[in-house]
Regions:
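Structural signature of beta-strand start/N-cap positions in the alpha/beta core
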Residues: 14, 40, 58-60, 90
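A short, hydrophobic beta-strand element within the central beta-sheet of small alpha/beta folds
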Residues: 78-100, 108-109
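Two-component/phosphorelay signaling modules centered on CheY-like receiver
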Residues: 22-42
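Conserved phosphotransfer microenvironments
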Residues: 63-82
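Acidic phosphotransfer microenvironment of two-component signaling modules
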Residues: 22, 45-49, 114
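Conserved acidic carboxylate
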Residues: 18-20
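Acidic, metal-coordinating helix/loop segments flanking the phosphotransfer/catalytic sites
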Residues: 29, 43-61, 69
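Non-catalytic signal-transmission and effector/linker regions of two-component phosphorelay proteins
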Residues: 1-16, 99-125
Length: 125
């Protein structure tokens, strides 16, 4: 009740990455291990899987594709994250488009690793 039963990793920071493209998940996990070896990365390939993980675990940061599998589905993950208590600033949406995104969603263009690394560092301070 009230998140007390959520599982916390032994690492200081746990990041959830959500993308329906397995190749993107693999590339991100490899990149993250090189850039931030102090974090533990969990991955989800569907909206349902992501929401189940959000309900069962505590995450420091959630990074989600906007179009998983269709445009806007990432907003369902954003809503679940906010309901779980994660600050809106600790949610990053990856997208090639900015259409229909609420102002409170932090957007990083897919493939812009410099901007993504900056956003991750700001969220994990």
């Amino acid at each position: 009740m009230f998140g007390r039963n959520k599982i916390r990793s032994k690492q200081d920071h746990v990041i959830l990455l959500v993308d329906d493209d397995k190749g993107q998940l693999d590339v991100f996990a490899t990149w993250m291990a090189a850039v931030r070896p102090d974090v533990h990365v969990r991955a989800a390939a569907t909206v349902e899987e992501a929401i189940n993980l959000i309900n069962a675990h505590t995450f420091s940061l959630i990074i989600s594709d906007y179009s998983i599998p269709h445009a806007g589905a990432g907003l369902n993950i954003f809503e679940a994250a906010v309901q779980s208590g994660i600050p809106k600033s600790n949610f990053i949406m990856l997208s090639g488009t900015t259409d229909n995104l609420p102002d409170e969603v932090r957007l990083v263009s897919k493939g812009d690793l410099v901007a993504l690394e900056t956003a991750i560092q700001q969220a994990l301070v």
